[in-house]
Structure formats: structure tokens, C-alpha cells
Design a protein with these regions (language model features):
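A beta-strand edge to alpha-helix "cap/lid" segment located at domain peripheries
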Residues: 1-29, 34-120
Length: 120
């Protein structure tokens, strides 16, 4: 499995965890200790805040990732950039450009930074 496939598999695992209500556990294990998420509303969460917010977060029904591309950011890091679309009940779909930056450390890929930019 190449790097793009490995990172995309992690992205899908993360989205599935958000659909299943286990995002707090998944991202608690995936994120680096100093990791952060920058959300569509402008909030910036450190790892502990991500875990706490996902503990009670409503689940998504479905999701899709399109336009995925990998950007190498260093010898032990890479980012995936894509468009994500998620659906929940009768709400309008959430759609944003997303970037996940990973660092290879301790023998595995860890999420260092995740960022969302909502689409109009």
C-alpha cells in the first residue's frame, strides 16, 4: 500500500467513526499529542478538545470524499486535500474543502493538523 492509500484509508476510518459515534476514541488515538483541528466555523481545537467535542457529537448518516490528492510536506509528513460531503438526517449536507496533515512517528501515521473550509 502506498502513502496515499494508507492516508486515505485513515481518512475513511475517521469518517466511519464519525458515522458510528466513535470519533472521540478514533481521533484520540490518531492525533499527535500537539495536534489541532481548525473547523469550518473558525474554531481551533487541540487534541483534548477534539476528544471532548466528539464524545457527544451527533453522528453523520453518510459521507463521501472526492478530488483527493496527496502533497508531500517533508520526509516524514504528508497532507491529503479533498472535498468532503456529509449528510445527517434532513439537514442540508455539510460540504467543505479539507486538508489533513499527517506525521509518520512511532512507526505509524498520526494526524497533526486537520482543517476545513466550507463551500458556499
Amino acid at each position: 500500500m502506498d502513502t496515499t492509500d494508507e492516508l486515505l484509508a485513515l481518512e475513511h476510518e475517521g469518517w466511519r467513526s464519525l458515522c458510528e459515534g466513535t470519533g472521540d476514541t478514533f481521533y484520540g488515538e490518531l492525533m499527535t499529542e500537539d495536534g489541532a483541528m481548525v473547523l469550518a466555523d473558525g474554531s481551533v481545537f487541540d487534541r483534548d478538545a477534539v476528544i471532548a467535542s466528539l464524545d457527544q457529537a451527533p453522528t453523520w448518516d453518510t459521507y463521501e470524499l472526492t478530488g483527493v490528492r496527496r502533497i508531500d510536506t517533508g520526509p516524514d509528513s504528508a497532507a491529503l486535500v479533498y472535498t468532503g460531503r456529509a449528510h445527517r438526517g434532513d439537514e442540508p449536507p455539510f460540504e467543505a474543502r479539507m486538508a489533513s496533515t499527517y506525521r509518520y512517528t512511532g512507526g505509524r501515521w498520526r494526524l497533526a493538523l486537520y482543517q476545513q473550509t466550507p463551500l458556499p
